[in-house]
Swiss-Prot record:
Signal peptide: 1-22
Lipid addition sites, S-diacylglycerol cysteine: C23
Name assigned to this protein: Outer membrane lipoprotein omp10 homolog
Sequence similarity: Belongs to the rhizobiaceae omp10 lipoprotein family.
Superkingdom classification of source: Bacteria
Organism: Mesorhizobium japonicum (strain LMG 29417 / CECT 9101 / MAFF 303099)
A Gene Ontology term for the protein's cellular component: cell outer membrane
Keyword Signal: yes
Amino acid sequence: MTIARKVLSIGMAGSFAMMLAACTTSGPDAPPMAAAPKGVEGSWIDAKGTGLSTFTAGKFATVATDTGQKLADGSYTMTGATSVEINGTSLIRQTPVSFNCLLISTSQLNCTSSSGQNFVLTRRT
């Protein structure tokens, strides 16, 4: 019977050691990964680098990269998985602006103004 008790004690000690090992950590957690961009949310710069447009929660604003002066603001609506409609006001000209854009990749937005002018915005990270 004493042999059976020893075997049982060793088995219990082994189980207890395994439970303790499961409670320990192997070191600091890895830093959280940045969330992938969702739709057009974020900052975009034009091809010439003169205007920075920021899209957040259905609103957009464009500022001059050299002075920070606000050039335009308004709203945007995702009209499909990769298409967006942008409407607002040019604050310099005090005229309405309207654009349709296609999200070509997570970092490129191809746009056409209501007057037919094409331009490309690149996501700023």
